[in-house]
Amino acid sequence: MHKSVNVTYYLLSLLLLFTIASNCSGQSVDTKEFLPANDSLKGKLLFVTECHEVRTNYSEYQSVISKITANFTASDTLNIFLEAPFTLSHFINQYISGKNRILIDSILRNDPYKIEFYFSIKKLKKNIRFIAVDFEYDQGNPGGRFESYKLYFEELKNVLANSNIDLSVIKSFIYGIKVQGLEETDFYTFKKYIQKLSVNQSDPILKNKLKESNFVLAALQTREKPDVRDKAYYNRMQELLNAGISIAENMNLMIFGSAHGNPYNEKCLYHKLNYADDSPFKNKVKIFANVYISCLSYGSYNAKSIVLETVGLYYGSKEDKQILDLVLKNYKPEIENSFTIVRNTFQSDLKDVDKVLYWGIHYKVK
């Protein structure tokens, strides 16, 4: 019985990957100008600005990560900071290290493009660590944040069970996640419970898990304004890095939506990372700015699909049209459904264009 189910699952997985490959085969991807080995990026941060839900984004990131890690030795690590909750990065890291398949079997089961992306990262077999500290739970709205949050506390329940701790409190909390919905007082009460369990805890596995859970519960639980989210992300990222994540000797990549990367917005994440006195990346941020020319953006971030005509770096600002005209003046895309990396040689008085290493040009992507 189990063998039959496993064979069926394997065949369905192959069919899924074949379907994705067929859908992506029409894409033209040109990354020959991306030469990370020549850019002295170790200890710096390559900040990638994106507009969400464009099909070539995943082809881009797969190519970029493959090139960055191509000559890695066993002592090298790539840190990838995502616009995502900690609980999602927790399961991403488990999957790419071969520990379990919760990421693709549950959290991303309806998103074949992301499944293919993480499958390709796993196949690289390199030291890659995903780091994410954005808001969690999202008030129970359907999607990856809700799913990863729910599964994270199911995992905590199993850890508590292995330590013979009464499960009534955590079962009630999980019920609230799944069915009832959680209020601010629920988070506060459960966080106090976790802190109480941590006192004088001698089991190192349980102690570390409780500490991690406390960090998860301290996150924003709703989609706040970008400046509120960015401040929280920056502070929580600092907390993780101070706990022992090395960046100075490693390569560091950050992939974030354009609203968080505008150099003219002093409250955005990019500005904090490159200019704040307490930033570990102060004056060490390089920009990889994505450009979208007549590209379709799907799904979850928009009420409906929209066509993008923008440079992600200045999206939504008055500078966007100026930088888009500059890009098109210097580079004329010809192949539809294409992505091309172009090394920045453009001259402009717009802020921080001189910090752009690469333009990632997406052209007529459907």
Task: Label each region the model flagged.
Residues 24-366:
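Compositional signal for N-terminal targeting/processing segments
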Residues 1-34:
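Bacterial Sec-dependent N-terminal signal peptides
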